[in-house]
Regions:
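Catalytic cores of extracellular degradative/oxidative enzymes
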Residues: 17-21
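Membrane-interfacial, low-structure loops and terminal tails that flank and connect transmembrane helices
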Residues: 50-71
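Flexible, glycine/threonine-enriched loop-and-boundary segments that flank and lead into catalytic domains
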Residues: 102-111
C-alpha cells in the first residue's frame, strides 16, 4: 500500500499535481515507502542468513555469506537481484522522491536507469533465478548446460549494473529522455 502511494514521485515534475500533494508525497508517503522497502530489503537476506546458519555456518558475522552457494544460479541470481533492486534501484528511487532533485533529473536518462535497476535487475533476474529452481523440480531433470547456468546470473546482473550506472551517469550530465536530439540543435547527429 505505501509503495503505491509513494509511486507518485514519478509525477512531481508534471504540472497537474497540486503543491500540497507534492509536499505530502515527498514527505510522509515517501517515509512509509522507505519503511516498507526496508522491511522487504532486510527480510529476504535475513532469511538467507538464517538458512545458512542452520546449515552450520556460524563462525563470525559473515561466514554464512562466504560459504553461500554462489555456484547455484538460484541463489546467485536472487542475491544479485536483491543488491541491484535494493541499492541501485532503491536508493535512486528515494533520491528521486525529493522534489528538488526530481526536478533536475526527471526528464533525463537517469530515470530510465533507475527503472532498469528496479525492473530489469530486480524483477527479471529474480524470475530467471526462479526458473533455475523450478525447471529441475518440475521436470525432474538436470539443466542442459549447468556451467552456463552458473555464470548467467553474473553476466546478466553485472552487465545490467554497468548499463544502469552509465544511464544514471549520462542523466546526471543532462542527457535528455523523451527527445531525440539532446543538444536541441535540429541536427540528426550532433557533429554535423
Amino acid at each position: 500500500l505505501f509503495l503505491q502511494l509513494a509511486s507518485a514521485h514519478h509525477l512531481l515534475a508534471d504540472p497537474g499535481i497540486s503543491t500540497e500533494w507534492k509536499v505530502v508525497n515527498t514527505s510522509y508517503f515517501m517515509y512509509f515507502a522507505v519503511l516498507a522497502s526496508m522491511i522487504h530489503a532486510l527480510s529476504i537476506p535475513g532469511a538467507m542468513e538464517v538458512a545458512q546458519r542452520a546449515r552450520g555456518y556460524n563462525k563470525g558475522l559473515f561466514e554464512w555469506l562466504r560459504k553461500a552457494p554462489w555456484g547455484n544460479p538460484t541463489f546467485s541470481g536472487v542475491f544479485i537481484a536483491l543488491v541491484g533492486f535494493g541499492f541501485l534501484g532503491g536508493i535512486t528511487g528515494v533520491m528521486m522522491g525529493t522534489e528538488q532533485l526530481n526536478l533536475l533529473i526527471h526528464n533525463t536518462i537517469y530515470v530510465p536507469g533507475h527503472f532498469h535497476a528496479t525492473v530489469v535487475i530486480g524483477t527479471t533476474l529474480t524470475f530467471m533465478a526462479l526458473t533455475y529452481f523450478l525447471i529441475p523440480v518440475l521436470f525432474q531433470r538436470e539443466m542442459i548446460a549447468p556451467g552456463l547456468a552458473k555464470i548467467q546470473p553474473y553476466l546478466f546482473g553485472f552487465s545490467m549494473y554497468f548499463f544502469c550506472l552509465v544511464m544514471m551517469g549520462a542523466g546526471t550530465l543532462g542527457v535528455s529522455r523523451r527527445h531525440w536530439d539532446m543538444a536541441f540543435q535540429g541536427a540528426a547527429l550532433a557533429y554535423e
